[in-house]
Amino acid sequence: MGGKDMKVSNEIIAGKLIMQIQIFIDNSRISSLEGRYGKVTMIPFTGHVKSEIFTGEIVPGGVDVQIENAAGNRNMCAKYMFRGTDKEGKECSLFVENNGYVSRTELQKEYVDAFPRFITDSKILGEYLSQPRF
C-alpha cells in the first residue's frame, strides 16, 4: 500500500496495493460434485489481512465456489467476511464477494480476472471500497 500521505477517502490509488489477503485452505474440507452436466467444487477457507486501511481475520464461513459447466467454462465466487479494525482504529466488519469467469480456453491462465464487491460498517472503508473502481 502507498506512502504515509496517502488519503483513503475518494482517491484512486492507481497501481498501488491496498490490501493483501492471506488465505489458508484445509484440503480435507474441500467438497466436490461432478456429473454429466458440470462440476462444482466448494473450498472453505480462513485467513487474515493486514494493510494500512484495515487489519482483520476471516470469520468462519468463508468459501470459494467454483462451477464448471458441460462446455468447460467456469464461474468462481468467493464470499467471506472479516472482523477487525480500520485505519482509524475502529472495530468493524468487511464483507467481500469476488466473482470471476473463465472460458474453457483460459483455464490455464495464471491469474483470473475477478470483480470484487465490498460491504462494510466502517465509514472510512465504505467511502473508499464502495466506489466503482475495482
Spans of features found by a protein language model:
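Beta-strand-enriched cores of mature, soluble protein domains
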Residues: 2-134
